[in-house]
Amino acid sequence: MVVVRELVKRFGDLEAVSGVNFSVAAGEAFGFLGPNGAGKSTTISILCTVLTPSGGSASVAGCDVVRDPLGVRRRIGLVFQDPTLDEYLTAEENLRFHAQLYRVPRAQVARRLDEVLEMVELSDRRCSLVRTFSGGMKRRLEIARGLMHSPQVLFLDEPTVGLDPQTRSHIWSYINELRARERITLFLTTHHMDEAENCDRIAIIDHGEIVATGSPEVLEAAVGKDRIELHVDDPTGAIAELRDRYDIVAKLSEGFVVFQVAGAEEFGPRLLAELHTATRSIRIARPTLDDVFMAYTGRTIRDAEASASDHMHAARARRGRR
């Protein structure tokens, strides 16, 4: 359904996407996981024909994104990262406008309106102005809009960005339901680990390159080590002691000393007894997708976001000096 080969996108000196390769099967939920600035939104913009690639090739639903962009657009739905609803129209008016743009047959519009509004539980608000909606309701309406023309592939670019945890959970309930009912292929980008767990397969992207691909279960099992987080009085000393005494590479992330080790339940008590710096707390967890990201990149996803931001600022500064 989606095939990408050696895809490249450059913005001046900045190579946002660096020769990525992947494919997505029909009916699959595929996730692009990575920090802000990793190349996720750039890739999805190319697949949706918003951007033209600098190199390589990509096809969606059998249509090449460069040679047949209109064919791609007819076959996809898109939920943008930023809100794009007209807040001075009602929910129904927004959907009808979208149906006109995609030339949905007039005889099908009323039925499809009922279906998508019921799916996202907004039937009772169809005549309400969008400006009266909460953030979660607007997101649900955007998902409904993306489904109005019955696309083969639905692209979701950071579908729950800016929403609180409870609303995020509700949005994912709707997404999982629509996948079951519509039998649609989903392609989503996210930097939330828990969202990626909803996918059949994920690709982890960092600095424009895919560093790992597989199901969440397979990727987590491949790490094979538990995660330990220490809150200590002297993080620098603890990191040095872990390196010199136990041959363990640890990182400082959000004030915690973080590292991976096999048999953490046995090693943890021993470490507390032997570590020279005072320990305020210790947390042991089974491998997560955050650990997978750290295993492949040497950083947590939050640290990677900070690095990506610095990288983009530096690139802009170089262009500004010319």
Map each language-model feature to its residues:
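Helical segment within the ABC ATPase nucleotide-binding domain
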Residues: 169-182
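Conserved catalytic motifs of ABC-family nucleotide-binding domains
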Residues: 150
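Short, charged/small-residue-rich alpha-helical element at the C-terminal edge
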Residues: 225-300
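Catalytic Walker B motif of ABC-type/P-loop ATPase nucleotide-binding domains
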Residues: 154-157
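Conserved ABC ATPase "signature" region
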Residues: 96, 100, 107-125
